[in-house]
Amino acid sequence: MDILNAQGITKRYANHLALSNLDLAIPNASIFGLLGPNGAGKTTFLRIINQIIFADEGTITIENRPLSQNHIEMIGYLPEERGLYKKMKVGEHLLYFARLKGLNRTEAIKRIKVWFKKFDIPDWLDKKVEDLSKGMQQKVQFIATVLHEPKLIILDEPFSGFDPINANLIKDEILELREKGSSIIFSTHRMESVEELCDHIALINEGVKILDGPKRDIKNQFRDNIYSLEHLTPIKELPDGFEIKTSQKIDEGMTETIIHIADNQKANDLLQVLIGQTEVRSFSEVIPSINDIFIKTVKEQAHG
Amino acid sequence: MDKIWLILTREYTSRVKKKSFLLATFLTPLLMGGLYAAAIYFAVSDSEEKIIKVIDESGLFVDKLEGRNSVVFEFVTEPVDSARKKVENGSFIGLLYIKDVDIDDPQGINYYSMTTPGIDLIRGMNRSLETVVRDAKIKKMGFSKSALDSLNTDINITSINLSGENEKEGNSGIAMAVGIFSGMLIYMFMLIYGSQVMRGVMQEKTSKIVEILVSSVRPFHLMMGKILGIAAVGLTQFILWIVLTVSIISIAGPLLGGESAEDMVAAQSGIAQAELAQSPEAQNKLLAAIDEVVDSVNIPLLVGSFFFYFLSGYLFYAALFAMIGAVVDSEADTQQFMMPIMLPLIASMMFLGVIIKDPSGPIAFWMSIIPFFSPIIMMIRIPFDVPLWQLVLSMTLMVLGFLGTTWMAGRVYRIGILMHGAKVNYKVMFKWLMMKN
């Protein structure tokens, strides 16, 4: 089942089309990567889900009910542009945000304490936001986003400005939230940063969806039967169906060779031939990155 | 509504807890008290006698010249040159030298001093001299002075206002003071707290909290929560000011009053000042003054309309200020948008004199019904009694006015707060105003 279903979303601004007839379905308990370059329309779409702005056309349903003010409490949103009240204490701040999301006071305080324990920051309650480092503020922002235990968590460029330690911490939390049944939408233009996390991916460019589906399917779809080989002595000749694309020395007598296998051949057969000719150090399939897939698809569209 | 309340409470508590709020709240009444004390102090110390030496060669003025405004004339009979030296070396403050003059054309009267005399001093001396010359002329012409004096008649017009239920004696002096005071309070309130709304909105925008907020509350609720929260802060501060100022004046006032000129002798002879304050005479005077205010001004109407214009005027302008805060990216950008909002406020202040001179005239009428001016101008007019229909019209327009500005501000606000780095001018603002959701 899908937690969110968007049909034919179109949004126009004065001088350009931000989203054009976008269909998206976010499956339950999954991590969904909404990928695309800057200006593709990602933030516009996220703002529409959060009812900050409204679509010109199209419908959105959450758990099969049309999007309404009632859904605010089940969504947690960490926008790309995020800040905190500098003069407020961390505890007050989290309490305020949680109450705006409909949580009552006692429950909110209880949960804040749980999160503080989890992040090992028990003495932050009375600290002023302005006394926190940037990394610390990011933790607070993340807690504020998930404190009301939203079923749909929307993170816009979540790792921009995060140091690697915090980024990993947040990644672990996100995986745990998915285990608990939440769905997470990740939006980013740095595709490599979320590739490993996502179950589903949608690529959008200039307001148009160009690809959409489970990550594994997309990757399979874009497999080119290309293998990478690291070996010592040069390869003499390969039988029909195997074609050397490139071959170059990398270091200390080691050579890297890229080989294309025809559809009717098997990788194992290639490996057997190779073992007869040279000493094989590594052998692996070249799987295209999301970034490569994106560039390839955009190019194909431009030509086709 | 719950969320407006949450926002309101946050705005209120975060501001009221600030040190600057506490400082302003408790220091301002002290400052007012201090100014009040200083004014009294200078009024008292200014009444010291100023002794001016007079050389009168005409003999016309001797023992007839009466000083005014704490000036005392002392006649001396020494040569002008030596007297001038005494002025130069500081033993005389001032020297008035009257030659042997012709009373029909008194020329060549000189005043010597080491400082340029104030206009009051010169005028006072002129009057003193003129009175003596006049008396001399009357004598010369052969009129009796008492016959002439009987030509002067004192007339006091008692103005009676017939518009109320009972005839009552109007007192335009007190009406004026009450009107100006309440108009000024409203002006200050709108300006100080209006610009706080603007700054608050701007800070939320520039520190980028706003997008998180509007994913939880509607932009209009966010704006209203802020406007109302700051209004509550302002009201708290005003009430505290009034309470504190009244208590400071009621404690310090009598103490200072005891030192004032009235009963300095008594004070010097060792009567405790506190006792003085409780003297029935002083109390009666105070009661009489209060009575006069109560009699000449319709208090319930005044208080009622004060709170009405106080709040509606604030709401009217705060919405406009919120709109500015939402469209700009920095404090520096606010200037160009502030001007049109400040203009009607400043104009209201500039026309204050005109309104007081003619509180029922056309300018007063128009300004008191147009919402941009009416909170200040109508408050100035009310103590002078305003026809009911004008008051109702003004209040109706005021309510429509703030509903209008709030609606307008809400529409610009919802777009503006999410726009960063956009070059905003009035055309863009108008486009946002007209933009559908």
Range-by-range predicted roles:
Chain A
Residues 224-300, 304:
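Short, charged/small-residue-rich alpha-helical element at the C-terminal edge
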Residues 10, 68, 91, 191, ...:
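Alpha-helix N-cap/helix-start and coil->helix boundary motif
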Residues 9, 97-98, 218, 274, ...:
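Broad structural signal for hydrophobic residues in well-ordered alpha-helices, predominantly aliphatic
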Residues 70, 219-220, 267:
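A short local loop/turn or secondary-structure capping micro-motif enriched for an aromatic residue
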Residues 2-6, 11-205, 211:
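ABC transporter nucleotide-binding domains
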Residues 172-258:
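ABC transporter nucleotide-binding domain
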